Amino acid sequence: EAGSIIYELKVILAKPEIGQVGGNNSMLSKEITIYISPRISLDERSLKYLEDYGIIDVVSDVVRHEVGHWEFPQFSGRGCPYDWFLAEKIFNSIYKVLRSKKDGDYVANMFMDVVDNTNVAFSLNQKERKYKGLAWFYYDQGKSAGKYTPLYDWFVRVQSHLWMGEEEKELLKPFFNDSSIGEKIDKLVDELFERLELKKNDYNLEILLDKERWEEQARVFAEIAAKLLPLGTPIEALSSGERYGEKSSLEKK
């Protein structure tokens, strides 16, 4: 089911900087590296989620996410950024809004993760399978952070309205911000959906996988993200393993 690029998969028993599972890929070296903590700790809430839905392997979904940046499923032509040329266009569009490279790299990865995850979730759903391991990844990030930082909160909420079911939303609920910050985040979620003409509780793949729109979509995504960056530096890792301040593995240079 993987993309047309042949990757070497490396699994390393080592705790990521935050959370218990992480991954990254390099198209230059054609390697996907997965980091797994030697000792996985599950609290009652996450254990119940995994047991209720018969999830015995969250790592496979992390791998699917990494592959999905380039193509998923195989020979579908669907992926984000899909190739270096399109990746560069996305990065450049975001850099025009966010002058700090640290901000730009992190937000560009967020945008590509949203498109990638939505496509992978849709593709699995077509085979009557779920993308529940990725929701657990976000739970693990929230558990490690204590509460989502505002930008990461927005990033997860956006995805909750695209590809997550009610069970995933309930699982992640403890880490969403409430009060005035939560209200601001909800309004910015609505703003993104309105400006990109997206429908909630829909994959919206005709819009999100339209490569001709990515530069404009990335610009809008960055403009909204810029309203949350002053509220706190994100500490969480993205699905691709990148943390704020790290060079993106999706950037060629």
Model-found features: residue ranges?
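Short, functionally important secondary-structure microenvironments
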Residues: E1-K253
